[in-house]
């Protein structure tokens, strides 16, 4: 098994591409060992000293470090990923549900505007962000403000504020005049 690695805009996060599907639907962002109990692979990764976050996408895994150098962490992370996939173990523990983004909020009168915002995020924003090892999902829309959840490499990335303000906000304002601002949640 060959696992590729890619740098992300966040220097504390690396993207690992195992060359096979990772998560069937959506994404899953795990920020501590307690949350990692949902996934045998995440438990293995959080067992490595210095790992502070694990994010699963359709065909990639991003790992965030709190401490340590990538030179020391990367071989251990690669080993844990390889062991997991070679064992045939499931990504999610029995009884763990696939992730859901059901807790959205917006006024029903804004449903058409929200549909346009979500389509732009799905078609223009998420594919670009996934290339960097992260994900951005719609959370809500209220009084002209779009609320987004930043996950994976995007969470805590030094350039995420610029991406949000200059990239995503400008895109949404261009296509959806009702949008005045974009904020992270």
Where are these regions (language model features)?
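Domain-level signature for proteins that mediate thiol-based redox and metal-cofactor handling
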Residues: 1-185
């Amino acid at each position: 098994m060959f696992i590729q690695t890619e740098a992300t805009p966040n220097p504390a996060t690396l993207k690992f591409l195992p060359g096979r599907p990772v998560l069937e639907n959506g994404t899953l962002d795990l920020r501590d060992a307690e949350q990692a109990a949902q996934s045998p692979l995440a438990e293995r990764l959080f067992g490595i000293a210095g790992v502070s976050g694990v994010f699963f996408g359709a065909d990639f895994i991003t790992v965030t470090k709190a401490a340590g150098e990538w030179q020391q962490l990367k071989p251990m992370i690669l080993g844990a990923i390889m062991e997991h996939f070679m064992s045939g173990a499931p990504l999610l523990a029995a009884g763990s549900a696939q992730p859901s983004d059901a807790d959205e909020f917006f006024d029903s009168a804004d449903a058409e505007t929200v549909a346009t915002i979500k389509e732009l995020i799905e078609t223009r924003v998420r594919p670009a962000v996934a290339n960097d090892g992260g994900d951005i999902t719609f959370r809500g829309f209220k009084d002209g403000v779009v609320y987004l959840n930043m996950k994976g490499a995007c969470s805590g990335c030094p350039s995420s504020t610029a991406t949000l303000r200059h990239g995503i906000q400008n895109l949404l304002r261009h296509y959806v005049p009702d949008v005045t601002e974009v904020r992270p949640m």
